[in-house]
């Protein structure tokens, strides 16, 4: 992929755009399609969805409406817990591919580890990769012990681990583990998932934002980028989509990076992968 902005190189040498649009909670149809089209018009070349978001069809529609060649847009989607298991995952992939209207998917992830089936699910992802139906495969919400278990039987190690990560929950131990095993990190809810986190009202971020004439959200996105983290802020608002992409004309100083690093509280907002089993514990 020829990136028109920063990319990270995965361990299979595929390049993945470092800033993407997340579409969690976007309504399928016009809302999702418009958000995707606006993002691509603003310069994004990475869209992150999942089957459980129920908006894959809208993502595909937005890509087609943008007029940008398919090969220039990175698309990530995910297999849901109730579809885990070898055969069910293969069927779930084809369903997602059909909904998206795409011949291939750039990155396919296991959405949550669940309890029992992620090893067999991973074997299905390896098959999809070997058949060139996906350009990369990975996981989401996997802790080091989940990855260690997967390493015991996998032929291909995950290229990406998408996890909750923001200034109040910086996942340093997990980031270091993934770095040691050459697994790229993607941050979901990089801005803290709304008002409940209060991240964007933090005075440290506010002061840094003023210095650069940027918003606190832009500062957080820039912090991710300078740490080598792939980041996928979500929005369906055209102005915010454009604002979140406008982060290439400034750079945080070492001191500013350190100040943000010191905000960590190990404050998880979303589910804990060790006791969060959406879609049923049987997964």
UniProtKB/Swiss-Prot annotation:
Swiss-Prot/TrEMBL site (Lowers pKa of active site Tyr) positions: 78
Coiled coil: none
Enzyme class name: oxidoreductase
Molecular function, one GO term: aldo-keto reductase (NADPH) activity
Source taxon at top rank: Eukaryota
Ranges where the record places region Disordered: 264-283
Keyword tags: Cytoplasm, Fatty acid biosynthesis, Fatty acid metabolism, Lipid biosynthesis, Lipid metabolism, NADP, Nucleotide-binding, Oxidoreductase, Prostaglandin biosynthesis, Prostaglandin metabolism
Residues reported to bind substrate: 111
Active site: 53
Biological-process GO terms, alphabetical: prostaglandin biosynthetic process
UniProt binding sites for NADP(+): 23-24, 48, 140-141, 162, 188-193, 234-236, 240-244
Compartment(s) of residence: Cytoplasm
Reactions accelerated catalytically: prostaglandin F2alpha + NADP(+) = prostaglandin H2 + NADPH + H(+)
Record pathway: Lipid metabolism; prostaglandin biosynthesis
Predominant cellular place of this UniProt entry's protein: cytoplasm
EC number(s) from the headed UniProt entry: 1.1.1.-
GO cellular component: a single term: cytoplasm
Subunit structure: Monomer.
Record-stated family: Belongs to the aldo/keto reductase family.
Role summary: Catalyzes the NADP-dependent formation of prostaglandin F2-alpha from prostaglandin H2. Also has aldo/ketoreductase activity towards the synthetic substrates 9,10-phenanthrenequinone and p-nitrobenzaldehyde.
Protein name stated in the entry: 9,11-endoperoxide prostaglandin H2 reductase
Organism: Trypanosoma cruzi (strain CL Brener)
């Amino acid at each position: 992929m020829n990136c028109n902005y920063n990319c990270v190189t995965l361990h299979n040498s595929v390049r993945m755009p470092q800033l993407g649009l997340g579409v969690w909670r976007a309504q399928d149809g016009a809302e999702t399609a418009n958000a995707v089209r606006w993002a691509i018009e603003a310069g994004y070349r990475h869209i992150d969805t999942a089957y459980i978001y129920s908006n894959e069809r809208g993502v595909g529609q937005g890509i087609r409406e943008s007029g940008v060649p398919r090969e220039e847009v990175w698309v990530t989607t995910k297999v849901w817990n109730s579809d885990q298991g070898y055969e069910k995952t293969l069927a779930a992939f084809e369903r997602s591919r059909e909904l998206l209207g795409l011949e291939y998917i750039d990155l396919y992830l296991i959405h949550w580890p669940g309890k029992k089936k992620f090893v067999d699910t991973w074997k299905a992802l390896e098959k999809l990769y070997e058949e060139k139906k996906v350009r990369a495969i990975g996981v989401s919400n996997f802790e080091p012990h989940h990855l260690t278990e997967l390493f015991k039987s996998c032929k291909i190690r995950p290229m990406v681990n998408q996890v909750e990560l923001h200034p109040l929950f910086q996942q340093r131990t997990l980031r270091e583990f993934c770095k040691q095993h050459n697994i790229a990190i993607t941050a979901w809810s990089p801005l803290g998932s709304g008002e409940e986190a209060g991240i964007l009202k933090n005075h440290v971020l506010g002061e840094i934002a003023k210095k650069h004439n940027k918003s606190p959200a832009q500062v957080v996105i820039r912090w991710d980028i300078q740490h080598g983290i792939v980041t996928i802020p979500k929005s369906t608002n055209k102005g915010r989509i454009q604002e979140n992409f406008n982060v290439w004309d400034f750079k945080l100083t070492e001191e500013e990076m350190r100040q943000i690093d010191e905000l960590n509280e190990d404050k998880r907002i979303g589910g804990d992968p060790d006791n969060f089993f959406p879609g049923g514990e049987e997964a």
